[in-house]
């Protein structure tokens, strides 16, 4: 391990018998987890970079820790497209792919299978600790040129962020809580809120990632309390859509897209727990938290600060340097702000200005609309003279939706045309990529 002051422990669990995870309905202790980490670390190839493709969240956590033990950097990619993986491999020729399933990277990238059974020796083992400056992860964003852009995360920055989030969310009062996530751990929000938060705060991550509402409810019911649900607005909306009973939880965390206040209120009432929304980005990680039923104002995690200049809003904190945020922010002070929307989402039509996020909020707030999104068509000269929208609204027609929108937004921003779809092409975190929307628009334009 590299030198440096005060190495940072992998785990926040204080006893070998503390529960680190739940897998296949059974608790996994810290001692067992550390034995798995040591056993896997011995089997990893001598490489510098790894894409951890493990679907099982427990195995992913073991793989992450084993890579840290071997001083290997874990790469988090914006998608699992084979072409992207090959492009990344050109930049990192010592890359390999760790998998626990049938998914393979393709091309010339070496794949390493997570063993079905690791030899476990439950002897007392010291908890690994790593230098704060150790390179832990490279988180890739799509990049303005279409070429993935890496953002380096040190172990110190990742651990500090998880501890700051835990302090703001009050997880100390939920000692040993089980974390169930509907989001993949290969993306920043999932990594921070379902893996690192558990490891650093002495919580228990859940190996599975249920998708369908009935499966999510069953998985929650199977967990002991306290229990925390980590999800997204689109998953939350699906969970609450049928109006049926959902299990009581002790906290709900939500991120990746704007959360409608009405949905937040419904979630708190149905789950019987506070819902906290997390704001962040791949470049900076998690930055701020708010409880939407109480306030629209975001408050930065301890150690994070904001400033503004002619370029926009900058954030510093958690040892990650200074990052320019890609959002329109109304700064109250260096710790508190209101979020106005994405910089790239701003539209100006007939001298009137708004954001696509604002319009999406009003669209999805219409009774009977299950999902929806506004898009700004690419027009000659770069000017936007009209907007389009895609909507999932069985039981409604265009007249009903446009009539409801007229009561909520300026007529200049009404969608022309309005397309009805059975589902929007959201990814595993509930996001809609620009490319996915472009393909959807092209499909309808060709009809």
How would you label these PLM feature ranges?
Residues 90-101, 152-168, 174-238, 251, ...:
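AMP-binding/adenylate-forming
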């Amino acid at each position: 391990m590299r030198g440096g002051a005060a190495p940072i422990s992998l785990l926040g669990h204080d006893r070998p018998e503390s529960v680190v995870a739940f897998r296949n309905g059974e608790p996994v202790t810290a001692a067992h987890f550390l034995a798995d980490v040591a056993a896997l670390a011995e089997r990893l190839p001598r490489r510098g970079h790894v894409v951890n493709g493990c679907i099982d969240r427990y195995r992913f956590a073991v793989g992450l820790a084993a890579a840290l033990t071997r001083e290997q950097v874990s790469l988090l990619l914006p998608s699992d497209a084979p072409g992207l993986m090959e492009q990344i491999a050109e930049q990192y020729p010592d890359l390999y792919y760790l998998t626990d399933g049938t998914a393979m990277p393709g091309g010339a990238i070496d794949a390493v299978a997570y063993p079905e059974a690791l030899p476990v020796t439950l002897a007392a083992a010291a908890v690994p600790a790593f230098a704060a400056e150790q390179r832990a992860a490279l988180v890739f964003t799509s990049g303005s040129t279409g070429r993935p852009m890496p953002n380096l995360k040190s172990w110190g920055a990742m651990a500090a962020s998880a501890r700051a989030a835990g302090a703001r969310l009050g997880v100390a009062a939920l000692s040993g809580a089980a974390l169930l996530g509907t989001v993949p751990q290969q993306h920043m929000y999932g990594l921070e809120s379902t893996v690192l938060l558990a490891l650093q705060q002495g919580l228990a991550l859940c190996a599975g990632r249920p998708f369908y509402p009935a499966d999510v409810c069953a998985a929650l019911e199977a967990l002991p309390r306290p229990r925390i649900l980590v999800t997204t607005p689109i998953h939350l909306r699906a969970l609450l859509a049928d109006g049926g009973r959902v299990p009581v939880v002790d906290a709900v965390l939500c991120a990746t897209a704007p959360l409608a206040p009405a949905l937040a209120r419904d979630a708190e009432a149905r789950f019987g727990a506070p819902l906290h929304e997390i704001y962040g980005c791949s470049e900076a990680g998690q930055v701020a938290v708010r409880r939407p039923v109480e306030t629209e104002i975001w408050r930065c995690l301890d150690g994070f600060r904001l400033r503004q200049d002619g370029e926009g809003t900058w954030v510093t904190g958690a040892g990650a340097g200074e990052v320019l945020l890609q959002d329109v922010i109304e700064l109250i002070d260096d710790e508190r702000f209101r979020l106005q929307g994405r910089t790239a989402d701003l539209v100006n039509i007939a001298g009137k200005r708004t954001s696509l996020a604002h319009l999406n909020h009003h669209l999805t707030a219409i009774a009977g609309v299950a999902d929806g999104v506004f898009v700004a068509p690419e027009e000659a000269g770069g000017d936007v003279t009209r907007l389009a929208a895609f909507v999932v609204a069985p039981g409604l027609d265009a007249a009903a939706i446009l009539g409801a929108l007229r009561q909520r937004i300026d007529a200049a921003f009404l969608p022309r045309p309005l397309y009805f779809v059975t589902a929007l092409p959201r990814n595993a975190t509930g996001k809609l990529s620009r490319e996915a929307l472009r393909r959807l628009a092209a499909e309808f334009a060709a009809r």
